[in-house]
Amino acid sequence: MRDETPEQPAPLRFGYTTGSCASATSLAAARLLLTGVASDTVDIVLPKGQHVAMRLAFCRATDDGGAEAGTIKDAGDDPDVTHGALVFARVRLVHEPGVRFRAGPGVGTVTRAGLPIAVGEPAINPVPRRMMTEHLAALAAEHGYAGGFDVAIGVENGEALARKTMNPRLGIVGGLSILGTTGIVRPFSCSAYIASIHQGIDVARANGVTHIAACTGNASEDAVRARYGLPDIALIEMGDFAGAVLKYLRRASVARLTLCGGFGKLSKLAAGHLDLHSRHSSIDLPLLAEWAGEAGASAVLQHEIRAANTSQQALALALAHHVPLGDVVCAHARRVARDIVPGEVDVETLAIDREGRIVGVAP
């Protein structure tokens, strides 16, 4: 009997950003107004020069003399909150040249300073705005049109979807943001999450926040909120991306930073890992045993910690013997952070257990 050959996994599919969807639908609607031709697909050029054809769900005239077009957002194999959502554009021709952007249903409006879009503007980021403007300008030139375009971008159920994003905390109300820098969604890319971390820091700074807390999850946010009473705008949901916070503070510093996370996550940071996800870093139990020794653990206890199954078991062993392992881990984590952020930033680290109790502090 021959050995079975495992199937090779299919390559992950790329998708398209909401910015690409907005560009395609606004172009299709505008073309209908200028030519009378309703398209099934529309070709657009992405920021790096790639040409793509996007399929439309509809392209039709509206009762107010305008036109609208929609497309189903395909994020490829990326677990994107907007995957499968209907992104649409409603376009009207206006006398004044240029493009005026409006937030349609399901697209948010900026209410706080610190984002790349001014307060009061629809949450359509700079690159999607540029993409739409360039495509519409080329269309106008092609058909000798000297007027402008009123463009409203919407996302079906966008207001509900936005509650699953960081938009409410960033001060974007009423819906989603239209995003994208390359026009392409890369499967399981971290870039969008890291960008939201940076935006959170920018918004906090622009609104006068001097103490921010970067947290790995909801439990650590609750612990920081209970300890300091910080407002939501000061809480940065960093997840596993500690490095994204620390490195960004080199160019956008604050007076005070609190880093808070589960004991296991903080032990990874203490060991020098800046990506705390299990795919990229692991718990170093021998190192935890060594640190327990720094905190006064006996040789026997160090051996037990080294043989523990999890970081939580190691912590429980230490606490049962009144060894402040959490404080030592936090001190090492603070040292790692201190080596990255500017000297003027006051850094503190907090570790919590699975019940959300603070088990380590390094002020």
UniProtKB/Swiss-Prot annotation:
Record field: catalytic activity: Co-precorrin-5B + S-adenosyl-L-methionine = Co-precorrin-6A + S-adenosyl-L-homocysteine
GO biological process: anaerobic cobalamin biosynthetic process; methylation
Pfam families for the chain: CbiD
HAMAP family linked: CbiD
SS bond partners: none
Protein's organism: Burkholderia pseudomallei (strain K96243)
Pathway as given in its UniProt record: Cofactor biosynthesis; adenosylcobalamin biosynthesis; cob(II)yrinate a,c-diamide from sirohydrochlorin (anaerobic route): step 6/10
The family this protein is said to belong to: Belongs to the CbiD family.
Keyword line: Cobalamin biosynthesis, Methyltransferase, S-adenosyl-L-methionine, Transferase
Transmembrane annotation, as ranges: none
Protein name: Cobalt-precorrin-5B C(1)-methyltransferase
Gene, per the UniProt record: cbiD
Cross-referenced PANTHER family: COBALT-PRECORRIN-5B C(1)-METHYLTRANSFERASE (PTHR35863:SF1)
Known EC number: 2.1.1.195
Signal peptide feature range: none
MF annotations from Gene Ontology: cobalt-precorrin-5B C1-methyltransferase activity
